[in-house]
Curated annotation (Swiss-Prot):
Belongs to the cyclophilin-type PPIase family. PPIase D subfamily. GO terms for biological process: protein folding. The gene is cypD. It catalyses: [protein]-peptidylproline (omega=180) = [protein]-peptidylproline (omega=0). It comes from Dictyostelium discoideum. This is Peptidyl-prolyl cis-trans isomerase D, mitochondrial. The keyword Mitochondrion applies. InterPro entries: Cyclophilin-like_dom_sf, Cyclophilin-type_PPIase, Cyclophilin-type_PPIase_CS, Cyclophilin-type_PPIase_dom. One of its GO terms (cellular component) is intracellular membrane-bounded organelle. It is found in: Mitochondrion. Residues 10-173 form the PPIase cyclophilin-type domain. Keywords: Isomerase, Mitochondrion, Rotamase.
């Protein structure tokens, strides 16, 4: 550790009308400061409206892709389908580094290839070494992994979308 205090942020998640609980993440702002700051600011909503015309905020967005024994993915607050999202730096930003390797419970950037990070993220629910070197790990679940598992176990359609929406009803910094 470099003496930098790692930020902690939270999601309050519900499935349909049922509250699931709180997930707390510790962000690796000492290793990937730009990536961690993007996620932190999208949790607080402090950057206002983005270039898309939508608030730069995860609040109200859903987990649009859930694959059992792999990961849960969210962060598309512009479309809600997995085709959108936007970073606090503009539509996308470059990969910062791949120093941290994927493990169960890590928080990592979803992307469409090299240097295409936006707001979409995923939380791993299984060992995923095949993702190393292609997705930036920028944090980990430190509380509420049981809530992540509830999202992972949601009934999904053929497109891996939960049939009862799993929504981030609140989020912020601790």
């Amino acid at each position: 550790m470099t003496g930098i205090i790692r930020n902690k942020v939270f999601f309050q998640i519900k499935q349909g009308n049922t509250p699931l609980g709180r997930v707390v993440f510790e962000l690796y702002n000492d290793i990937v400061p730009k990536t961690a700051e993007n996620f932190r600011a999208l949790c607080t909503g402090e950057k206002g409206i983005g270039k898309s015309g939508k608030p730069l905020h995860y609040k109200g967005s859903s987990f649009h892709r859930v694959i059992k024994n792999f990961m849960v993915q969210g962060g598309d607050f512009t479309h809600g389908t997995g085709i959108g999202g936007e970073s606090i730096y503009g539509r996308t930003f470059n990969d910062e580094n791949f120093l941290v390797k994927h493990k169960i419970g890590c928080l990592s950037m979803a992307n469409a290839g090299k240097n295409t990070n936006g707001s979409q993220f995923f939380i791993t629910t299984a060992e995923t070494p095949h993702l190393n070197g292609g997705h930036t790990v920028f944090g980990e679940v430190v509380e509420g992994f049981d809530i992540v598992k509830k999202v992972e176990n949601a009934e999904t359609d053929r497109s891996d979308r939960p049939k009862a929406a799993c929504v981030i009803e609140d989020c912020g910094q601790l």
